[in-house]
Structure formats: C-alpha cells, structure tokens
Amino acid sequence: TGDTGRTGRELVTVTSIDELAESAERFEGRIVGIEHGAGIMARTREALTAYGLGGRYRILETSEPRMLDRLAAAVQRRQWIVLTGWRPHWIFELYALRFLDDPNRVYGGEESIHTMVRRGFAEYAPEAYEVLSRASWHPEELERLMLWIHEGDGDPYVQALRWMEVNDETVDSWLVADE
C-alpha cells in the first residue's frame, strides 16, 4: 500500500490541511513540492483551491532531491515545513513525518502497489511466479530497504540481501507455499 499527500513533522502541531491557513506564517506561506508535471503537484494545486489556501500559500516546484534538501535543512533547524509526500519513500524511515488529514479527499485514499509480470510469465517460470504472488511488503519494510539503498553503498542488490537476512521469516513465507 502507499499514500500520497502533504506531510508535516512531529513538532508541527497542524494535523489537517484545513488548518494550514491559520499557520501560513509558520510555514512561510510555502508548500515545497517536486516537478510541475507530477500527479501529486496537480493535486496540490487543486488542494490550494479546495481549502482556500491560494492567497496564503505558494507552491515551490523543485525536484525531488531539492525538496529533500529543504526537508533536511528544516529538520536540522527545527522549522515548520509542509511538502508533497508519498509512501513508500525512505524519508518516512529517516524522519518523523505524518500525512496531514485531507477532509476534502483531494489526495484520495490509500493506494496499492501491485507486482506485474509479462504475459506468459506464470507458464515460463511458475516457481518464480509463485514467489512473486506470495510476496507482500508493508510500506515500513520497503522504506527501510529504500533508506539502506540511499544511505548505503548504493548497490540495491547488496542492500536487498541485507534486508532478506534481517527479515528471513518474511522471505521464508514467500518461498514456501501454504499447506
């Protein structure tokens, strides 16, 4: 499963998007986002209208790395920040973030991530197909692996092996068919 929306750090007392208007000054009237064409950015522009935030906030469209740099700087300085966020993402493993409630459901509800394989894969590699059909991740597990890749030597294979060692019971459940 995954989510998209606005996130705020634990020191931030705002818990809902509809509370942002009264705290515009604390957030410096800025919502930090990613590239203009991203779906989450279109929803953020809709949210400005839906929640009447247009006159109080502007969206800072950057890149994901720049958004993450701004988040790191705000955390270090203990400043309030609101940004576009989604799960799974390693920032949720590294920082104490939360999604703001979205009473108008501009961002929708919980989303899902599905494994997809090419047509005929089940016949071509039935054992691999069975493992993939049993594999299930919680966002927190995937975020931990993503953080290890981000912070580690950058080799996803090495970090995946590390994750498998730490989570051997989970991996075993993927490898053994239910009786």
Protein language model features and the residues they cover:
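A conserved helix-loop-strand patch within extracytoplasmic ligand-binding domains
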Residues: 1-34
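A bilobed periplasmic-binding-protein/Venus flytrap-type ligand-binding module shared by bacterial periplasmic
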Residues: 1-11, 111-125, 148
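Extracytoplasmic/secreted proteins, especially bacterial periplasmic and envelope-associated proteins
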Residues: 15, 19, 39-46, 66, ...
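Metal- and O2-centered redox machinery and metal/ROS homeostasis
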Residues: 17-22, 28, 46-57, 79, ...
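Sec-exported extracytoplasmic/periplasmic mature domains
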Residues: 22-25, 49-53, 72-76, 133-137, ...
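Ligand-binding pocket segment of bilobal, Venus flytrap-like solute-binding proteins
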Residues: 35-102
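Periplasmic-binding protein-like
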Residues: 65-66, 88-139
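C-terminal functional modules
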Residues: 139-179
